[in-house]
Amino acid sequence: PHPAGLAGTHIHFLEGVNVERMVWTVGYQDVIAIGRLFLDGQLYTERVIALSGPQVENPRLLRTRLGADMQALTAGQLKAGDNRMISGSVLGGRTVLGATAYLGRYHNQISVLLEGRHREFMGWFSPGVKKHSNLGIYLSNFLGLRPLAMTTNTNGSQRAMVPVGSYETVVPQDYLPTHLLRALIVGDTEMA
């Protein structure tokens, strides 16, 4: 699951943060930059990043610099269509547009997804031949169709949060994420 590889998850299990304990993290590429600063006396701004996502023709690693122009890095590398470029991962990055089309300081990845601007009529009623489901309720799960190309479509508008145990299966920390999210949705920060 996604959060299992994040530094915050490891900190939570090894040495949890509290009022008296402060924890710092340093990325591996920043460790290299610090080492080069002490060895050469110069600021090292090179980075190796991943160019990834279903809309990338040839996903691979790229050698670039901090704050690189993402339009230049992805020129001629993307499939045709209305694409959304994200500096960072699809879950923790930021959409880049116009003046913000640069690689983020702490990002090691460029993600590219197809914009999901279409609405499917009665999509909840379809057999879901090309849809992803965490619970395995769509036909694509039974047919073993993998990988499925993800888009930015959220398949609808705001709706009620139904507790079916999906969050509990992917969040590795020892708390109940459904209760936390429900409290945050209604603005009850005391309960959260």
Regions found by a protein language model. Name each.
Residues 1-192:
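Buried, small/hydrophobic-residue-enriched core segments of structured protein domains
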